[in-house]
Curated annotation (Swiss-Prot):
Gene: rbfA
CC per GO annotation: cytosol
One GO biological process term: maturation of SSU-rRNA
Family membership noted in the UniProt record: Belongs to the RbfA family.
InterPro entries assigned to the protein according to its UniProt record, in alphabetical order: KH_dom-like_a/b, RbfA, RbfA_dom_sf, Ribosome-bd_factorA_CS
Protein name from the UniProt record: Ribosome-binding factor A
This protein's UniProt keywords: Cytoplasm, Ribosome biogenesis
Residues spanning the membrane: none
SUPFAM superfamilies reported in the protein's UniProt record: Ribosome-binding factor A, RbfA
Matching Gene3D superfamilies: 3.30.300.20
The protein's role, per its UniProt record: One of several proteins that assist in the late maturation steps of the functional core of the 30S ribosomal subunit. Associates with free 30S ribosomal subunits (but not with 30S subunits that are part of 70S ribosomes or polysomes). Required for efficient processing of 16S rRNA. May interact with the 5'-terminal helix region of 16S rRNA.
Subunit structure, interactors included: Monomer. Binds 30S ribosomal subunits, but not 50S ribosomal subunits or 70S ribosomes.
Region (Disordered): 126-157
Length: 157
């Protein structure tokens, strides 16, 4: 992907800017109102550009809205590709593939799981602070046994 080829990385950044600004300013489709382009990855041969997108505020939980947005992006794919070609000045414009970015939704779920774990840790710490032994502090020590603190009388003269 774009990580190994500096030219591919530059083109990916350009495609991200062009596609994001075009969705915001030129495409007047209500289905794309809350779309954000999160990343673009271009193959080293510059033939394919995967455009990762997400919907703000939805994190992928609204399946119907996500499908409608995907359809709108697929319909606008040709227009967006021509805009990229015009602004980039490339001999061959990469084919655009729109992929829903699952990372924000998964990150939200992970944050929820971590919050629950933190709450449980705090409850455990409070329980530990007030905990007492079920029996004696040292279950192996009995009151009827002599203590180990004996003095050695052999040194006295």
């Amino acid at each position: 992907m774009a990580g190994t080829n500096p030219r591919a990385a530059r083109i990916a950044a350009l495609i991200q800017r062009v596609v994001a600004s075009s969705i915001e300013r030129e495409l007047h489709d209500k289905r794309l109102a809350s779309i954000t382009v999160t990343e673009v990855r271009v193959t080293n041969d510059l033939q394919i550009a995967k455009v990762y997108w997400t919907q703000l505020g939805h994190e992928g939980h609204e399946e119907g809205e996500r499908k409608r947005a995907q359809q709108a992006l697929d319909q606008a794919k040709g227009h967006l590709r021509s805009l990229v070609g015009h602004k980039a000045g490339l001999r061959l414009t990469p084919q655009l593939q729109f992929v829903f970015d699952e990372v924000p939704g998964e990150a939200h779920e992970i944050e929820d799981i971590l919050a629950v774990a933190k709450k449980r840790d705090e409850e455990l710490a409070r329980a530990r602070a007030t905990a007492q032994y079920a029996g004696d502090a040292d279950p192996y020590k009995h009151d009827d046994e002599p203590s180990d603190d004996f003095e050695d009388d052999s040194d006295e003269e």
